[in-house]
Curated annotation (Swiss-Prot):
Mg(2+) binds at residues 14, 41. The keyword Cytoplasm applies. The active site is at residues 14, 42. The lineage of its organism: Bacteria, Pseudomonadati, Pseudomonadota, Gammaproteobacteria, Enterobacterales. This is Adenylosuccinate synthetase. CDD domains: AdSS.
């Protein structure tokens, strides 16, 4: 039996992981966020109500589940409290069942100002970040100057270190970026009242997870962003600042690879990307309009229009290998309903040399062109279908082709935004390894 399941994105984020996590956590004891911060946006529809979570693990909507924000996550205490209060308005209370690692780096105002100032200075070369301070917060961690959640427990040293860091940031913000400075006293004034609210949640989450594993509890590891936004394996520099591929689970929680039983790669039935950077299958035609409108392809964190394109199986196969995926979950299949034909990119060609490129390096991206296989679309509705057998023949064909190309099974198919719009092809908790 598979107890510990990782759910991660195989594309550029926004694959629909939140809903899948929500569905699978129903049968689990723990749900764990291991990387990223409130740059993520996980949208869930429960009883026709839309709930968007950025930082709190999506699975916490189930009342018996314990949520962990592990050490790999960068945490804004303000965002955390905002989300806790938002959940309370939906009668979801997280008291005594949400724990935050004492080692998680904090995101504070100076990170956000630095993120914004940098993007502004980069002008047309900007990365298109979410402006949430994610990059600067991870830089502080690597530079070993970060304030971490555990530091909130000692007000005196917190204020001394905060003042030093603010001086360091203000020097760059003002002298180099010609940006407004931040005020250390205001940051401290706003931060102090948050401490009481989260004090009891601060724990050694690694130990909690080790105990849970020893007690045979089921754990869902909830990824944020997608594999090609990974700082090491993504389309650098157009990436986020964390490891959104499988390695992030291990470093971001303190749980070793032997304890991970099944790795589910969540893949949208087509592709989207927010922000700038390579996107070989990008479309600018009526199909783009179809995906945007029918798929509501607007960022849940920033509201930006997502770029859209056909499914990129070259990237997907790379993702299968990077993450050692056990199986796939195809989401938003219903968005393809009504398209006359459907394409899958199965290779990249260099437009100058006409060579087939296995995976482009940084300078090669601009010279590649996707090679497509084309399949007939379907005119029937797949929205809300719950059994594989009920899908139109052409839709099953499309799924089969994805399995053939990637050489791994499609175990779950999401056919709409609601929790219940889902096909479980196999029960992944019971698949033999
Ligand atoms: P950052 O994570 O805010 O630094 O943004 C870096 C890049 O990652 C930008 O292109 C963002 O649009 C993208 N990004 C960050 N988080 C998400 C996400 O949750 N979904 C999709 N794209 C994201």
């Amino acid at each position: 039996m598979n107890k510990n399941i990782v759910i991660l994105g195989t594309q550029w984020g926004d694959e629909g992981k939140g809903k899948v996590v929500d569905c699978l956590t129903k049968d689990s004891s723990y749900v764990v966020r291991y990387q990223g911060g409130h740059n993520a946006g996980h949208t869930l529809v429960v009883n026709d109500k839309k709930i968007i979570l950025h930082l709190i693990p999506s699975g916490l909507l189930h009342k018996n589940v314990i949520g962990i924000i592990a050490n790999g996550v960068v945490v804004s205490p303000f965002e955390l409290i905002k989300e806790i209060k938002m959940l309370e308005t939906h009668n979801i209370f997280v008291h005594k069942r949400l724990f935050i690692s004492n080692s998680s780096p904090l995101i504070l105002q100076y990170h956000i100002e630095m993120d914004i100032a940098r993007e502004k200075k980069l002008g047309i070369s900007a990365l298109g970040t979410t402006g949430r301070g994610i990059g600067p917060a991870y830089e502080d961690k690597i530079a070993r100057r970060a304030l971490r959640i555990g530091d909130l427990k000692n007000e005196k040293t917190l204020s001394i270190r905060l003042e030093k860091i603010v001086n360091y940031y203000n020097h760059q913000l003002v002298s180099f970026y010609k940006h407004k400075p931040v005020d250390y006293k205001i940051i401290l004034r706003d931060l102090l009242p948050t401490i009481d609210l989260i004090y009891d949640m601060i724990k050694d989450t690694t130990s909690i997870l080790h105990t849970a594993i020893q007690s045979n509890k089921k754990i869902i590891f909830e990824g944020a962003q997608g594999s090609f936004l990974d700082i090491d394996h993504g389309t650098y520099p157009y990436v986020t600042s964390s490891n959104s591929t499988i390695g992030g689970v291990i470093t971001g929680t303190g749980v070793g690879s032997k304890s991970l039983d099944y790795i589910l790669g969540v893949t949208k039935a087509y592709s989207t990307r927010v922000g700038y950077g390579p996107f070989p299958t990008e479309l600018f035609d009526d199909v783009d309009k179809h995906f945007s409108k029918k798929g509501h392809e607007f960022g849940s964190t920033t509201g930006r229009k997502r770029r859209t394109g056909w499914l990129d199986a070259v990237a997907l196969c790379r993702s299968v290998r990077i993450n050692s995926l056990s199986g796939l979950c195809i989401t938003k299949l219903d968005v393809l309903d009504g398209l006359h034909e459907i394409k899958i990119c199965t290779a990249y060609k260099n437009i100058n040399t006409l060579e087939i490129i296995s995976f482009p390096d940084i300078d090669e991206w601009k010279n590649i062109e996707p090679i497509y296989e084309t399949y007939p679309g379907w005119n029937k509705k797949t929205l809300g279908i719950k059994k594989l057998i009920d899908l139109p023949y052409e839709a099953r064909n499309y799924i089969n082709r994805i399995e053939e190309i990637t050489q791994i099974p499609v175990d779950i198919i999401s056919t709409g935004p609601d929790r219940s719009d889902i096909i479980f092809v196999r029960d992944i908790f019971f698949i033999k390894k």
